[in-house]
């Protein structure tokens, strides 16, 4: 670590690689709620946050684990389909909480078009949440529905069979779960 009279120690969360304060400041200055999308090794997490002086306040939250518990989703909780459905769910929950618009906060993730973060963003936009974005970054509809998994018969998709779902049936199952979410939240 550098020393000397001119050395300034970075904030702890910056040193730990958890927060980009320049990006966070830009998001906070906008004074809009943030759509925070994070992906872990097993699920996708989406939250609507507002910044307060005492700390961020969560207005709505959704996880891909919630899809399995509430809507009977049998697919993987970390794939593109689950990210889209989680985004759709957070969009509807945000509207119930009175949030009509938000800005995307993807944290320290690399900005890559077609990623799961953008699949969640597409779900939120499809639910009616206003988020400024370009259509070019969204994954294709075939990828969101899981057509790429259904067309692949590789043995790496055995987790689906353990959950009682054949990989070839994922697009139909996706449409079924999307219909359940839309009927529960979208018809209001």
Curated annotation (Swiss-Prot):
GO terms for biological process: ribosomal large subunit assembly; translation. One of its GO terms (molecular function) is 5S rRNA binding. Pfam families: Ribosomal_L5e. One of its GO terms (cellular component) is cytosolic large ribosomal subunit. It comes from the Archaea. SUPFAM superfamilies: Translational machinery components. Transmembrane segments: none annotated. Keywords: Ribonucleoprotein, Ribosomal protein, RNA-binding, rRNA-binding. This is one of the proteins that bind and probably mediate the attachment of the 5S RNA into the large ribosomal subunit, where it forms part of the central protuberance. Part of the 50S ribosomal subunit. Contacts the 5S and 23S rRNAs. NCBIfam families: PRK08569.1. Belongs to the universal ribosomal protein uL18 family. HAMAP family: Ribosomal_uL18_A. This is Large ribosomal subunit protein uL18. It comes from Methanocella arvoryzae (strain DSM 22066 / NBRC 105507 / MRE50). The gene is rpl18.
């Amino acid at each position: 670590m550098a020393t000397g009279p001119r050395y300034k120690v970075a904030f702890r969360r910056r040193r730990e690689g958890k927060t980009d304060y320049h990006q966070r400041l830009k998001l906070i200055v906008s004074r809009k709620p943030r759509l925070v999308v994070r992906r872990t090794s097993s699920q996708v997490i989406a939250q609507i946050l507002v910044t307060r002086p005492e700390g961020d306040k969560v207005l709505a939250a959704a996880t891909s684990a919630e899809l399995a518990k509430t809507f009977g989703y049998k697919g993987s909780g970390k794939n593109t389909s689950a990210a889209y459905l989680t985004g759709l769910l957070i969009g509807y929950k945000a509207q119930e909480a009175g949030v009509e618009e938000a800005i995307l906060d993807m944290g320290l993730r690399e900005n890559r078009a077609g990623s799961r973060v953008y699949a969640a963003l597409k779900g939120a936009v499809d639910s009616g949440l206003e988020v400024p974005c370009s259509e070019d970054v969204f994954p294709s509809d075939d990828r969101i529905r899981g057509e790429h998994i259904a067309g692949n018969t590789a043995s790496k998709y055995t987790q689906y069979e353990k959950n009682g779902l054949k990989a070839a049936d994922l697009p139909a199952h996706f449409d079924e779960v999307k219909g359940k979410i839309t009927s529960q939240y979208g018809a209001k």
